[in-house]
């Protein structure tokens, strides 16, 4: 008897933490990266969840700091022939899908994502085959192969609007891979949504009891929550949204103190947006518990200065993203559907 893959039961080994650099080493690699970016006609795109010094370097060199889709869109529009993607592997794949003519380099191809790992293509394809009457919607945090199996790709910033649209057409949905985001979208729309049971190892760790205690210490603080968090955390929020939406909420809310329930990498850009406000990390461990991620993705942490310099200098199979042409074509269709839908929302 075959046993169905259970993302909730999967344990993903974390990578070792990068060796800390001293100030002289940091300066050496910063200068080396700046030189290599010019020599390779490259631009650096970094995710909000990378370390502050990486985001700062992206800014200083004319690059981009954003969510995964905007990183790829920025790279596609940029004149550079090479993109250095500081993030996790699916982000590099998305950049390659949208810019097949460009060289896509990453500090390491071992930078994974628990949502991606928790949705292997063979098991997910079988799951979809078992429900042929449903439209398949997958989150951007998936492999190129999973995207190619989908009808739509979606980001958290437009997930509710897209599912509302599909529901209005009478469509039933398969949602993958994040069960918390899928549950949030279902509750917001009332749509018929069948969720794959994956989760982000960072957001899944936020704890209601610990957060309640923190709220008592800071009773006038607003709570900002990413919808990849458990429902009990989302229900406590003053604002729920994607990374970019949370930064906007930080500016809009009148509160002087903000408790932020997402990866602490976002603090760099959020603090720039609201320098007058105090940002507080939401707790990730319950009573007597020890956090695994401690509100920072361990794979994002692999994007260190030394690794970025090595990626630019060495290139090759250890650093360059490749996507099979047929797979790219299959993944591009649902990605373009999403981009077209997002454009109608902005119109």
From Swiss-Prot:
Transmembrane segments: none annotated. Signal peptide: none annotated. Catalyzes the condensation of iminoaspartate with dihydroxyacetone phosphate to form quinolinate. NCBIfam families: nadA, PRK09375.1-1, PRK09375.1-2. This is Quinolinate synthase. Binds 1 [4Fe-4S] cluster per subunit. InterPro entries: NadA, NadA_sf, Quinolinate_synth_A_type1. It holds the Pfam family NadA.
